[in-house]
Structure formats: structure tokens, C-alpha cells
Amino acid sequence: YLPQFHCIPENDKWWGKGFTEWTNVKKARPLFEGHRQPRRPLNNNYYNLLDDGNKTWRWQIDLAKEYGIFGFSIYHYWFNGKLLLEQPVENFLKDNA
């Protein structure tokens, strides 16, 4: 699970203000015939993992269960000994979602 769907000061500094993985999704281009890019989320649901409490987590968990997925592997970012992009996971764990 990639938790980079919200802004953090480090990404603003390194990649430009407002950068998230949605920035990369939006600028994707096809590389070969039949390569469908960019792949936009249904109903333009460019969610922010910090904006809606754990509503996005709950929606994704329910969708995963519906298709027989019962766990997530969550990527952790460490830069120079500092944990980054941790807030969505911390919010999730506090809420027992």
C-alpha cells in the first residue's frame, strides 16, 4: 500500500508544492500501442488520505474484502533516519478501522 496520496513538506520541497502520487498519475502517458495511460480513478476520486478521517481506508478495505483480499502491505518511507508519510497509517491504527 502506497501512502503517498497526501502532501508533506518534504515532497513540497523536493518535487514542488502540492506533490503527491496523483501528480505522477495525472502526467502518465502511453509508452506503446494498447498502453492505456493515464489511468484516472473512477469518478475523479483523487482522494487525500488525510482529508476524510478514515473514510478512504474503510472504503478501500471494504473493496478489498469484496474481492477476496484480506490484508495490506504498507510501504514505509525513511529518509536520513526520519520516517515520512506515516500520518495516514497512524490515523488508521488509532481509529481501529
Task: Tell me what each language-model feature is.
Residues 1-97:
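Glycan-processing catalytic domains of CAZymes
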